[in-house]
Amino acid sequence: MTDLPDASSRLAAAVTGFEMEVRVFPEGTKTAEDAARAIGCPVSAIVKSLVFVVVDEEGNEEPVVVLVPGDLRLDTALLAREAGATRSRRASLDEVRAATGYSAGGTPPFGHATPIRVFADERLRRNDPVWAAAGTPTTVFPISLADLDRLARPVWAEVTE
């Protein structure tokens, strides 16, 4: 994989046992709709890797990654419940980069800078393969659900509206 952005090369190098086929879209794939249009797949086959912070009853905060189908919205109350927290909030741009090593809009489902819990919405299973960000807002890669499960090791739950 030559001529990839540094973040995509770093992600590909961090993953073993999976041949990552990164595709670059210079016009960008910032939204699920943009990505689906560029790839030619349903919006539901796009994985949005969202970074949220869950907060427990003592006020302790923990960043988590939530994998959501591109056509659905995260339900923050369901996420909090699944995470054993009292509430959740969207992570700031600085929190996203600190927790994952990637910028918002390009966060991949695995290969993060720090150990971080990952949750995946059950409705991602409607498509196989799915497409996820490869470290930047202009790169994506296809991945089977089996490989996504093996590499991201998510807690599968219903966390969308």
Report the location of each language-model feature.
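Extended, low-hydrophobicity, polar/charged segments
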Residues: 1-161
